[in-house]
Amino acid sequence: MKKRFMMFTLLAAVFSGVAHADDAAIRQSLAKLGVQSTEIQASPVAGMKTVLTHSGVLYVTDDGKHIIQGPMYDVSGAHPVNVTNKLLMSQLNALEKEMIVYKAPDEKHVITVFTDITCGYCHKLHEEMKDYNALGITVRYLAFPRQGLESQAEQDMKSIWCAKDKNKAFDDAMAGKGVKPASCDVNIADHYALGVQLGVSGTPAIVLSNGYVVPGYQGPKEMKAFLDEHQKQTSGK
């Protein structure tokens, strides 16, 4: 028994060493390109790793010699599945406590919207919130300042997200009533970085519960129809 335990420990150490060696090669290759990785994980493809960076998701061979940028799709089922964004959903849900939520009384769907208070179509979407909610669509907001993290929009949205009543502060900003300065430990950069990783490049960007991203504004009825159809397709019904 003792010998078997020692052998298991030895094998674990060997495989751990191999994993760290692979990661080291990957980090070295990324460093040459000026890319900083936040996390390296296993990928669905043998011989490759998934690398999370602040500028998106990469797939890198274990030896660090080849890099693929962009989403990976699983086409083994009836419909393609974006496995890259599906992976990122755990990070999105980790920000749930920071989201500004408009919950539908009879919830049928939940969407997460990356928004910017300076975006015209974001205003249009928010003006129709009662219609989305009436159709059973719960809307959760994360901030995505299009002009960057040092912009006035970023500062204003941080104040909104730090307000005692975030929903009222957001409603007021969208109604043109201005933003009252406030501070807290909410980091808008986390919202922004996740948006970039999900492939968001403009607002509003609507993320479904499985990581599928719908770029741009969708009216309440159009959104409901799309969500119903998407749910049917992905559930196989």
UniProtKB/Swiss-Prot annotation:
Keywords: Disulfide bond, Periplasm, Redox-active center, Signal. Disulfide bonds join 119-122. The keyword Signal applies. It is found in: Periplasm. GO terms for cellular component: periplasmic space. Residues 1-21 form the signal peptide. InterPro entries: DiS-bond_Isoase_DsbC/G, DiS-bond_isomerase_DsbC/G_N, DiS-bond_isomerase_DsbC/G_N_sf, Thiol:disulfide_interchange, Thioredoxin-like_fold, Thioredoxin-like_sf, Thioredoxin_CS. PANTHER family: THIOL:DISULFIDE INTERCHANGE PROTEIN DSBC (PTHR35272:SF3), THIOL:DISULFIDE INTERCHANGE PROTEIN DSBC-RELATED (PTHR35272). Required for disulfide bond formation in some periplasmic proteins. Acts by transferring its disulfide bond to other proteins and is reduced in the process. DsbC is reoxidized by a yet uncharacterized protein. Also acts as a disulfide isomerase. Homodimer. This is Thiol:disulfide interchange protein DsbC. It comes from Salmonella typhimurium (strain LT2 / SGSC1412 / ATCC 700720).
